[in-house]
């Protein structure tokens, strides 16, 4: 599947670069989206299964992904400016296909290993608890996705509008990038921390901090706004690693890919909702209203996380309880 991800994305990008009209371009981009969607449910499950240091591995993987998103626009713009817009598709197409060939060459075929994957999680759950846990994860995925996307999408405009309307574009971009770097550093720090502190405890702390950061940002201005945004972004980035860790612990290897597929489907859906939400709320009350509503969503995330933590404490305590001798 990962080979299909690499080579499929490469061929789709090449087709987009060769597209003679908008219809062909749309078909190529649709194919690119289909192949790109393979990564999160398959790649994340493989990473978790293979690593012995889940926290650090997930954090590093997340930072690399965010770095790729941050660099993509600049690299594409440079290629389009200095070469042509088609080069912005051809260059990553070649890199994808070559990476896919190398991946298939150096990675052993593991079909038989896949059939022997464990069908029960590290911590067994009753069917009722499993359904409740999955329901909480759905609410967490939607609320975290909305909070994340509202902040990251609106961040440059928030800085521009709330600080000053006369700031140079380069300065605004620099401030927004600095705030996002705080998120990346938090992600790495949390990845280290979860190897020493129970992930569910960190999850509750991080989401609580995220709520406070969003609430502060809704009322702050000037330097205080930048600090509040940095706290909110750091928290929402940091919770991603802990969320993945908890899902890995309570999901069997054989089902982990499906669970991650549902989670990232909800996250991608929330991205589209966030764009419409920002537009509607900003038109009604500016970014004060946008950040205020985002704080309410962050509060929902925090409350749901507390419910998840309470369930985990109960399950873990029951598992550690010594069984009576027969």
Question: Can you name each region flagged by the protein language model?
Answer:
Residues 12, 24-38, 142, 224-238:
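Hydrophobic core of transmembrane alpha-helices in multi-pass small-molecule transporters
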Residues 28-65:
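Cytoplasmic helix-loop-helix junction between adjacent transmembrane helices
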